[in-house]
Amino acid sequence: MAPMIPPRLQRFPATASADEIFAAFQEDGCVVIEGFISPEQVARFSQEVDPAMEKIPVEVTNNGNSNDRTKRFSKCVIASPTFRNEIIESDLMHELCDRVFSKPGEGMGYHFNDNMVIEVQPGAPAQRLHRDQELYPWWNSMGPAGPECVINFFCAVTPFTEENGATRLVPGSHLWPEFTQINERDCPQFGKIETVPAIMQPGDCYLMSGKVIHGAGHNATTTDRRRALALAIIRRELRPMQAFSLSVPMKLAREMSERSQTMFGFRSSVQHCDVDMVHFWGNDGKDIAHHLGLEAPSVHV
């Protein structure tokens, strides 16, 4: 049987230390960070992606598909200057990513998997419960002791309420002894899982382990379009969902910080192995940035 689930979400202001937030993340697998994005940034970002979101049709499938009455948009870095110049430059985000993925002397241990606006429309059904690490199917076989494969900074762009489909989280599920497919009837917890809604104001986010069971809630309203920004980050050894370095114009890439260029695949991540320096996503043993004509990095990231 699974251990008792704490019926709460720990919450911290964005001014809290990364160590405090990370300790709660380790304990529960998910934690709310209040004010992760400023109100001004949220307003500008939402306005900048509005034109693209309006062009996306609303699908009504009624078949359990995760796109049922849910819009998704993954070109935030192109559509939003606020996103690429401010939101992804959060030092707190990178401090937490370092604690999850990076090791001393091994450089930047992570990059973006996806950046997605997710807008749950009125009447959208609840999403099936799942773990994000199931994107990489073998990861569940390692159980709770396995390394983190993916984390998500899931940011509220509009208010998250229980009525409009706030994400349902299962704190503590990252420590369950068995990581079986939770929607299968042979799962010991099938039909018995207690979820907690992530109630948030615009600018708040929850940081979630890829091991945590969760799913979007049912939007029972007739008017609310529950909009979120998902910043999904994976360990550098894994292939991302989005081919950013092939789809983002070089003009925009040149304007990014070295850190963001690495996050999107315009720079290699460097690992020191014994006496060698290994480039992940490199070119002929060198940093891919040289091939792309970018300036040499001031430090190895």
From Swiss-Prot:
Pathway(s): Secondary metabolite biosynthesis; terpenoid biosynthesis
GO molecular-function term, one example from the UniProt record: dioxygenase activity
Disulfide bonds: none
InterPro entries to which the protein is assigned, alphabetical: Phytyl_CoA_dOase-like
Result when mutating residue 150 to L: Completely loses its original activity, and instead catalyzes the AusE-type 'spiro-lactone formation' to yield preaustinoid A3 as a single product
Required cofactor names: Fe cation
Keyword Oxidoreductase in record: yes
Record-listed Fe cation binding positions: 130, 132, 214
Entry EC no(s): 1.14.11.-
UniProt-annotated site: Important for reaction specificity, residues: 150, 232
Keyword Metal-binding: yes
Top EC class of this enzyme: oxidoreductase
Catalysed reactions, semicolon-separated: preaustinoid A1 + 2-oxoglutarate + O2 = berkeleyone B + succinate + CO2 + H2O; berkeleyone B + 2-oxoglutarate + O2 = berkeleydione + succinate + CO2 + H2O; preaustinoid A + 2 2-oxoglutarate + 2 O2 = berkeleytrione + 2 succinate + 2 CO2 + H2O
Function: Multifunctional dioxygenase; part of the gene cluster that mediates the biosynthesis of paraherquonin, a meroterpenoid with a unique, highly congested hexacyclic molecular architecture. The first step of the pathway is the synthesis of 3,5-dimethylorsellinic acid (DMOA) by the polyketide synthase prhL.
Family membership: Belongs to the PhyH family.
Listed name of the protein: Multifunctional dioxygenase prhA
Species name: Penicillium brasilianum
Lineage summary: Eukaryota, Fungi, Dikarya, Ascomycota, Pezizomycotina
